[in-house]
Amino acid sequence: MGGWSAKPRKGMGTNLSVPNPLGFFPDHQLDPAFGANSNNPDWDFNPNKDHWPEANQVGVGAFGPGFTPPHGGLLGWSSQAQGTLHTVPAVPPPASTNRQTGRQPTPISPPLRDSHPQAMQWNSTAFQQALQDPRVRGLFFPAGGSSSGTVNPAPNIASHISSISSRTGDPALNMENITSGFLGPLLVLQAGFFLLTRILTIPQSLDSWWTSLNFLGGSPVCLGQNSQSPTSNHSPTSCPPICPGYRWMCLRRFIIFLFILLLCLIFLLVLLDYQGMLPVCPLIPGSTTTSTGPCKTCTTPAQGNSMFPSCCCTKPTDGNCTCIPIPSSWAFAKYLWEWASVRFSWLSLLVPFVQWFVGLSPTVWLSVIWMMWYWGPSLYNILSPFIPLLPIFFCLWVYI
């Protein structure tokens, strides 16, 4: 096997009836260790070499005309495998003579008592009595099986597979429902976080506006930096804790927070009163604005039971009531004033001032117009901190 030889080699390569499973190296011509069936071991002068361009030619294979390399395929070196076309006889071969004509009927199955005599004892009384023993029952029935009546049939394969699936994992959930279930809270959380960050800037903006009133025409500078605890130059709205002006900054922020809460409370009460959910019924006895008779402006009769009273009545009589035809907002304002006057008696001292202020309403309006004209360029900066509250007020107005 080790050397080159010009003499034809006898052995595995010379037996052309043995098929070459690979079909690429017929007769081991490309293997330099073999020179079988070669008059000249040199590949360039080997007349039996495999010409690869001829492999693209169409020849007759083992399964009819088709692509068959000239050196043969899985069937070896037969003439048909090498591409030689053989004439197939038109007459089919004769039928086999060792078969009977037609199909024979299926023989009748023997009775169960003959084919499976051991199965007949399952329905016997002795067998059922023996099953009462837990040790015997465990040999025939799995855990949780039933032994009443006849023996249980074979378990359902489909149900068994489904039970395995239920133990290994639940089926895939609807991704659309999962996405909508997660995106909704995430969007609400993002919107709430955005509104929260904007609302937290309201005290700082109002504090800046408040301190700017003390430094008209100049930049506000904290006065506490020249005290015994010197600090770097900073604004009075961002005092460090060691600055003496820090406590005044916290006091201003606290007053601003109370003002914002009062504003939200007033808006909520106005909204509830607008929807008739507050029993606001100001009583003005002896006033000429009252009218006795059928309540045309009331939505609920006097003797009716309503969860949200919206009728302002003084003396209900036979379905009639004394109605005060005033706007609900004025009724709400009077309700707040009466509520505050009871709890804060010093507010009664402001009544003459309020009456005088109302009497000077044209002057007041002119003053307001003048202030708006003066603060017009910076009006947006003053009102911009309250813009995040508008969506909250709108949601309360719609959903309450």
Curated annotation (Swiss-Prot):
Annotated spans, Disordered: 1-20
Intravirion side: 2-253, 203-253, 370-375
Keyword Cytoplasm: no
Disulfide pattern: none
Protein modification: Isoform M is N-terminally acetylated by host at a ratio of 90%, and N-glycosylated by host at the pre-S2 region. Myristoylated.
Residues covered by region (Pre-S): 2-174
Keyword vocabulary terms for this entry: Acetylation, Caveolin-mediated endocytosis of virus by host, Fusion of virus membrane with host endosomal membrane, Fusion of virus membrane with host membrane, Glycoprotein, Host-virus interaction, Lipoprotein, Membrane, Myristate, Transmembrane, Transmembrane helix, Viral attachment to host cell, Viral envelope protein, Viral penetration into host cytoplasm, Virion, Virus endocytosis by host, Virus entry into host cell
Stretch list, region Pre-S1: 2-119
InterPro entries tied to this protein: HBV_HBSAG
Gene Ontology cellular-component annotations: membrane; viral envelope; virion membrane
Residues covered by region (Pre-S2): 120-174
Residues with attached carbohydrate: N320
GO biological process terms on file: caveolin-mediated endocytosis of virus by host cell; fusion of virus membrane with host endosome membrane; virion attachment to host cell
Lipidation (N-myristoyl glycine): G2
Record has Chaperone as a keyword: no
Biotech use, per record: Systematic vaccination of individuals at risk of exposure to the virus has been the main method of controlling the morbidity and mortality associated with hepatitis B. The first hepatitis B vaccine was manufactured by the purification and inactivation of HBsAg obtained from the plasma of chronic hepatitis B virus carriers. The vaccine is now produced by recombinant DNA techniques and expression of the S isoform in yeast cells. The pre-S region do not seem to induce strong enough antigenic response.
Domain notes: The large envelope protein is synthesized with the pre-S region at the cytosolic side of the endoplasmic reticulum and, hence will be within the virion after budding. Therefore the pre-S region is not N-glycosylated. Later a post-translational translocation of N-terminal pre-S and TM1 domains occur in about 50% of proteins at the virion surface. These molecules change their topology by an unknown mechanism, resulting in exposure of pre-S region at virion surface.
UniProt similarity note: Belongs to the orthohepadnavirus major surface antigen family.
Name of the featured protein: Large envelope protein
Source species of the chain: Hepatitis B virus genotype A1 subtype adw2 (isolate Southern-Africa/Cai)
